C-alpha cells in the first residue's frame, strides 16, 4: 500500500500483482 510498483492500473490489472502489488488510486502499490 505505500511502495509504488512503477505500474499503472487505469485500463488493465497490475501485472506485478503476482509479486504482491495491488491497485490503488490507478497505480500499483506493494503493501
UniProtKB/Swiss-Prot annotation:
InterPro entries documented for this protein: Cyclotide (IPR005535), Cyclotide_bracelet_CS (IPR012323), Cyclotide_sf (IPR036146)
Cross-link Cyclopeptide (Gly-Asn) mapped to chain: 1-31
Ribonucleoprotein as UniProt keyword: no
Residue ranges crossing the lipid bilayer per the database entry: none
Keyword hit for Disulfide bond: yes
Record key words, sorted: Disulfide bond, Knottin, Plant defense
GO biological process, one term: defense response
Post-translational modification as stated in the protein's UniProt record: This is a cyclic peptide.
Disulfide bond positions: 5-21, 9-23, 14-28
UniProt domain comment: The presence of a 'disulfide through disulfide knot' structurally defines this protein as a knottin.
Protein task: Probably participates in a plant defense mechanism.
Family: Belongs to the cyclotide family. Bracelet subfamily.
Name of the protein in question: Cyclotide vico-A
Organism: Viola cotyledon
Lineage of producing organism: Eukaryota, Viridiplantae, Streptophyta, Embryophyta, Tracheophyta
Amino acid at each position: 500500500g505505500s511502495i509504488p510498483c512503477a505500474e499503472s492500473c487505469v485500463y488493465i490489472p497490475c501485472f506485478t500483482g503476482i509479486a504482491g502489488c495491488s491497485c490503488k488510486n490507478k497505480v500499483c502499490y506493494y503493501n
